[in-house]
Amino acid sequence: MQSTNKELFRSSVSESLKSTAPLMGKSVYEQNLNKIRNSDVNLSSFAFIFSELIQRIQSQVSGIQEFEEKLNEHGYRVGQKLVELVVWRERNPKRETRILGILQYIHSSVWKYLFGKHADSLEKSKEASDEYMIVDNNPLLNKFISVPKEMNQLNCCAYLAGIIEGFLDSAQFPCKASAHSVPLSQYPYRTVILIKLDPSVIAREEVLG
């Protein structure tokens, strides 16, 4: 069964690897951080690495909740470093102090930085003043992963939720972020990243007016 699941995870990645040429030239470690500002990661390379991460976590966990928690932890570390990198590359970095400002920045600039496009929408919860939602109709992280039947409730965008949580925590907007599948007929992988802000953030926002 473990072998079959690994093949399921690999199958869609293999097709991508066949059709995309490998990276050429210098290693990313040899390049100047500013000179590669507009460079893209080879899609097949990313798909392969992410698939390997999924398989590694799968061998360590016993259920979907634990699986998504592990994905979130890995993404969180990326989000922490992403703040530093974005600030380093910004020509005129601005520190966001308001909730809407930082979330709009993530919805547009950070999403484009990560995936080459803006997120599809940013929404505020009508039920809770401390909750916001970022929606991606066709998330890249779910595109190359075929989930086994017994894990059909798994959403690999838990990794993305971790990135957002790490980014916001490092930007002094502590929160909890989670990924939720909300499919539509035309968008079967549609995912909502639910962001629940820490009470201290809400209190600060009220002071700022």
Swiss-Prot record:
SUPFAM superfamilies: Ligand-binding domain in the NO signalling and Golgi transport (SSF111126)
Gene Ontology CC annotation, any one: nucleus
Listed GO biological process terms: endoplasmic reticulum to Golgi vesicle-mediated transport; intra-Golgi vesicle-mediated transport; intracellular protein transport; macroautophagy
Keyword terms: Endoplasmic reticulum, ER-Golgi transport, Golgi apparatus, Transport
One Pfam match: TRAPP
Predominant location category: Golgi
Keyword set includes Signal: no
InterPro entries xrefs: NO_sig/Golgi_transp_ligand-bd, TRAPP-I_su5, TRAPP_component
Subcellular location: Golgi apparatus; Endoplasmic reticulum
Gene3D superfamilies: Trafficking protein particle complex subunit 3
Disulfide bonds listed in the record: none
Residue ranges that the Swiss-Prot or TrEMBL entry lists as coiled coil: none
Family: Belongs to the TRAPP small subunits family. BET3 subfamily.
Function recorded in the entry: TRAPP plays a key role in the late stages of endoplasmic reticulum to Golgi traffic.
Oligomeric and partner information: Part of the multisubunit TRAPP (transport protein particle) complex composed of bet3, bet5, trs20, trs23, trs31, trs33, trs65, trs85, trs120 and trs130.
Name the UniProt record assigns to this protein: Transport protein particle subunit trs31
Organism: Schizosaccharomyces pombe (strain 972 / ATCC 24843)
Gene that this sequence comes from: trs31
